[in-house]
């Protein structure tokens, strides 16, 4: 190795160049040495000095077998995983997000601009042959099962949804027709005509000139006759209007008992001895005007 010159600045250009030269000079003898010399030195080091014996180490425990996982989850290693699909999905999400942001930006810029209406699906137009076949099948069967609907759709070259919607609309149309027919059969009764008297004509009351109002039902109201009782042949009517005077015999006073208590003692015979007076005249008069004689 060459002695390094004394330098005042260790980071000067000369110092850097001298360091490179020293590294090249140290590597040169190793490169020029023959391989036979290198082999001899290696053999001397290998047989001349034996390494110290290492202490015996315990044998490592046997490795546990890896846990059995289902195959579909570990088919590929991490290096073999396909990242192309993930990148495509990320690109699609970014594109959708970008479009939504642009749409919101446009709405904010033009708030008065009406939003675009969603385009409706075109209406399905059935051919005459398809309509004829559908009508013929509807007359036979108003409700179809799923296999029958699929078979009919394949025959008519339609989708199962189109056949289903057509049958729904046809059932609703048939129901409306039945409702209209029932309304026509029942009909609405004509309005009643009611006679109303004219009270004012040309600004003048016409109650006196008009004929008296007649009831549409021609019901005559008569005063209730009170003399509707049947006449008796043996009695005149003045006798019916006569006042009745009933006289009852006085009850004998009951003498108090010797004991002087507050109770009254009387017998049932005293009550039966009192007889009601017999009014003058026949008993039929007592039934007049709801009056009963006791």
From Swiss-Prot:
This protein is called Homeobox protein Nkx-2.5
Compartment list: Nucleus
Q: Compositionally biased, Basic and acidic residues: which spans?
A: 102-114
Q: Quote the biased-composition stretches of kind Pro residues, using this chain's numbering.
A: 52-69
Q: Which residues bind DNA?
A: 119-178
Q: Which InterPro entries match?
A: HD, HD_metazoa, Homeobox_CS, Homeobox_NK-like, Homeodomain-like_sf
Q: Which GO terms describe its cellular component?
A: cytosol; Nkx-2.5 complex; nucleoplasm; nucleus; protein-containing complex; protein-DNA complex
Alphabetically, the GO molecular function entries are: chromatin binding; DNA-binding transcription activator activity, RNA polymerase II-specific; DNA-binding transcription factor activity, RNA polymerase II-specific; protein homodimerization activity; RNA polymerase II cis-regulatory region sequence-specific DNA binding; RNA polymerase II-specific DNA-binding transcription factor binding
- The answer, when asked if Signal is one of the entry's keywords, is no
Q: What's one Pfam family the UniProt record gives for this protein?
A: Homeodomain
Question: What this chain does, per the record?
Answer: Transcription factor required for the development of the heart and the spleen. Implicated in commitment to and/or differentiation of the myocardial lineage. Binds to the core DNA motif of promoter.
